[in-house]
A protein has these predicted regions:
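Hydrophobic beta-strand segment of the Class I
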Residues: 334-337
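Nucleic-acid modification enzymes, centered on SAM-dependent nucleic-acid methyltransferases
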Residues: 1-332, 343-378, 392, 416-418, ...
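Residue-level preference for long, well-ordered alpha-helices that form the structural scaffold
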Residues: 381-385
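Short, glycine/acidic-enriched loop or turn micro-motifs at the edges of active sites
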Residues: 340
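Substrate-binding/catalytic lobe of Class I Rossmann-like enzymes that use SAM or dcSAM, i.e.
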Residues: 404-431
């Protein structure tokens, strides 16, 4: 709870979350914005114009012919009109699912311009047959797109909350973005820029490059992001740096979980008015629109609790974290989460968190090896995969004490992989 209070306190001191009328920003909704090559208009990239199903809120695109861009208004719809308006708002998104990757907009309501997003990105194949595009690779110090970038980003809606007299409840309101909101955005961006070097030196922000890989190629290819910090917008970097500064060994799991729920990859769930976690499907999927949590909403994540399980009096315990194939010490209990064939590349996903922890971790974690050790990951399917697992479980079996146990975490849709487990674990005495 102290961690959440510290986050809210520092955000309040900066004056970047309150509107001056008693409302605090709960969720900030952002989307990509691109220039249509046919019309020259800047177009927000929105798969749907539905903002909230529960509150019956939609966005409206308001053409501005002078600036050749769209203002975005926010409208509450009455219950009687909602089914029809919801259907219309779903269809009027600029990147509707039915168009399958095509940007669609009509400044005058008559002429519709359609352009493939692949064309806007400048997708092509190089001489070696690799997929490429014209997106600029971000520099390490970039925290927002540069003016000349193909993919811009804009704030298009803010959900505000205000405490009510009824304990534990808050009033909610979705609003269009105002000039005051944009000024607060500018203040956040400039503040982060001014402190970027100091925060990096103190280990409060990631300085790590994204290494090429099956999952990690996606944000590099689809957004031009080159460093892990690029997966976070200025508000998210600010919140992350504050949490990181106040983090202890006990609160580290909650801080890392907060990062999972607050990044440029966090889906805005219009059905539940929630900013979703990134790793709901163990991937690094980029989003055309996403949600950012304000401090009060992010505080819900860092206020989590872990149930302690004290050891019996006189019993000492040591927790070790090593690759199974390198295990050489005796142990009593083992928890292992083996690779899911080729389905989940944990060694790549770990780097999302390693980037935040490797510099200046809490004292209790100083001895940890902050490296994903990709080369050591047992990968693949078939005979090579099974042999790798047999070697790993043989080593675990050889070092387990009498009466010890292994907790195996494994989920997969492949019956063939499940069928291989008896040969990998059961026959090694680990079943």
């Amino acid at each position: 709870r102290e961690l959440a209070r510290a986050l809210a306190r520092e955000m309040d001191a900066l004056g970047v979350e309150r509107d001056g009328r008693g409302w605090r920003g709960r969720a900030y909704l952002y989307c990509l914005e691109v220039r249509c090559p046919q019309s020259g208009w800047m177009v927000p990239v929105l798969p749907t114009l539905v903002i909230s199903e529960g509150h019956r809120v939609v966005a409206r695109l308001v053409p501005d012919p002078v600036r050749k861009r769209y203002d975005i208004s926010i409208e509450y719809v009455d219950a009687a009109r909602w089914p029809e308006e919801k259907k219309r708002a779903e269809a009027q998104g600029t990147l509707p699912r039915a168009e399958k990757g095509t940007l669609v907009h009509s400044p005058d309501g008559i002429t519709a311009y359609r352009t493939r997003m692949s064309t806007i990105r400048g997708d092509y194949r190089d001489e070696q047959g690799n997929n490429r595009n014209r997106l600029r690779p971000w520099e390490k110090e970039d925290i927002v797109p540069r003016p000349e970038d193909i993919l811009q980003e804009r704030l298009y809606c803010v959900q505000w909350i205000r405490e009510t007299e009824e304990a534990g409840r808050a009033e909610s309101q979705f609003r269009a973005v105002t000039e005051a909101d944009l000024e607060r955005e500018r203040r956040v961006t400039e503040y982060v820029r001014a402190h970027l070097a100091d925060w990096e030196a103190a280990g409060l922000l990631p300085d790590m490059k994204i290494e090429a890989g099956y999952n990690t190629n996606q944000p590099m290819r689809e957004r031009g992001w080159t460093h892990w910090r690029h997966l976070f917008n200025p508000r998210q970097l600010l919140a992350g740096a504050i949490l990181r500064r106040h983090m202890t060994a006990e609160t580290a799991p909650f801080v890392m979980n907060a990062l999972n729920w607050n990044a440029r990859l966090s889906v805005w769930n219009k059905g539940r008015d929630t900013v979703q976690n990134i790793f709901y499907n163990q991937a690094l999927n980029t989003q055309n629109n996403y949600g950012c949590r304000g401090s009060a909403y992010l505080g819900n994540v860092v206020e989590g609790r872990m149930s302690p399980c004290p050891l019996p009096e006189g019993v000492a315990a040591e927790v070790l974290n090593l690759p199974a194939e390198q295990w050489e010490e005796g142990y009593d209990f083992c928890v292992t989460d083996p690779p899911y064939g080729d389905a989940v590349n944990y060694e790549e996903i770990y780097e999302f968190f390693i980037a935040w922890m490797r510099r200046n971790p809490p004292e209790e974690f100083r001895g940890w090896i902050w490296d994903s050790r990709r080369a050591l990951a047992v990968k693949g399917t078939g005979e090579g995969f099974r042999k790798g697992m047999v070697r790993a479980f043989r080593r675990l079996s050889e070092n387990m004490s009498s009466g010890g146990s292994i907790t195996l975490m494994f989920t997969h849709k492949s019956g063939a992989l499940w069928g291989g487990w008896p040969g990998s674990s059961g026959r090694r005495g680990c079943g």
